[in-house]
Amino acid sequence: MLRKNWLLLLLATLLLVVVVGCSSDSEVSDDDKANEGGKETDQDQQELPEMTEEEITLSYASWANHELNQYLADRFMEKYPNITVELVQLEQEGWNDHLTNLASTGELPDVFWYLGNVDIAIRNAWLGDMTEYFNADPENEDLLDTMKDVGYFDGERKLAAPANYYPYTVFLDENLFEQLNVEMPSPDWTYSEMIDLMQKMTVPEQGIYGYNTFTKLVTMAPIVNQDAFGEFGWDGESYDLTTDWADAAMQHSEFVRSGVHAPFFDTDEAEAAFGDRLLWAASTGRVAMQLDAWWTVGLFAEPEFVDKGIKWVPYVVPKGDNASTENKPAFIDFGAISSATEYPREAYELLKFFGWSKEGWEHKLEAFKTLQDDTGNLIFQHPDGLPLIKDQEIWDGLRALLPDSHYYDDFLQRAKHPIPLGGAAQPGFQTFLDEVYFGGEYGDVELATANGEVNAHDIAQDLTEKANQYREEAIEELFY
């Protein structure tokens, strides 16, 4: 009888565990949706294999600052004295070609970044499967929510991971706003507020323009307005260019033609407006907003701008008017371990150390503060990139290295849901851009729209169908 009761109790307990587990697994937040539609992990049920104690050598290649790479390599070797890290230096121009040449001779680095088009890396079988390590690593729970599920290109295997993060940044000239007696927007500004401000800050009689672009409205609008997980309205399953992309393309075109957008570099219009066709509009003091990237923070602190009375301050890309997320476009560099590496476990640890681990970031912060060039000057005038993890100590450490201004506090608080651009994150995307978006029957779609040759709304459905077709064909070609 006791044995029977014990068995019944055991069965009941097991049933309870199964029910609770299933209930827990069914609760998935929007932030857990992958760019490929979602990826579950079993971190609680797996353990990372031990690192080898053998004497081994790992090679590493990225286009990050070489002195920083060497500093991190030295710190990694201090932690693992049995591992030698060799840095492979390549020119960033033609990066993927250089990797192709190395791979052809069996010398693909154990850990490497690939540039732009992920199809090249997949087609050439460069990407090693790190699923076993990534899914079992408890450190990865601290990754920024939108960074956890990228890199599962076939929906199953972790083939790449985010290694570097520069957010899209909208710079506002605070002095110009003050000059025109226009109040600076809230750090929680919305997309429509940005569009309205561009028009309000355009003063033709004073030769003042609302904005200038490096980054684009057509990239921002679908991500922030559709709570998308990628460019062109990518929702984890498909693209949609029929709404916000088309609206943004037409809006930008109207602004170019009406003088809200500053004259383009090296044009007759720039010559007429600034007296120098080669003068960057952002350095004239006559542009209210510069749509750009985080790496420009340091440039805008240079005397070229300060001495002209230009005070560029950073804002995050505004939130969509009806958005439920803080998703914002970002330049994300992706890293991978080589499919040919003899030491995948150790290569994974090296990739993480250089990319997103807290320990690696602690060393990065120290490097930003202390590394000097041959003349004794600091190599980094400001931190290079933002953390890929949530750890507040790391964010606080980075904040301490930035100017003492509330704009930086406001920015960092709202820059923790980056969305990577398509080429490096989505199979088929770059091929679609090359063959359709910039080189298809419409020519350069954005240029044709700006010139009034096509209406973005008229071609958006065709572009949507082709974008989804290119993705499907890429998945079939690359994985099946």
Residue ranges and their predicted role:
Residues 116-169, 313-316:
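Hinge/lid segment of periplasmic solute-binding proteins
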Residues 237-272, 313, 317-320:
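Glycine-centered hinge/linker elements that transmit conformational signals in sensory
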Residues 47-65, 83-88, 110-111, 159, ...:
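Short, well-ordered beta-strand elements
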Residues 18-21:
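C-terminal motif of bacterial Sec signal peptides marking the signal peptidase cleavage site
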Residues 23-50:
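Short, low-complexity, disordered segments immediately C-terminal to signal peptides
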Residues 155-163, 168, 193-250, 278, ...:
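Extracytoplasmic/periplasmic solute-binding protein
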Residues 299-307, 323-329, 337-440, 478-479:
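C-terminal lobe and pocket-closing loops
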Residues 75-143, 178-181, 280-281, 285-289, ...:
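Extracytoplasmic "Venus flytrap"/periplasmic binding protein-like
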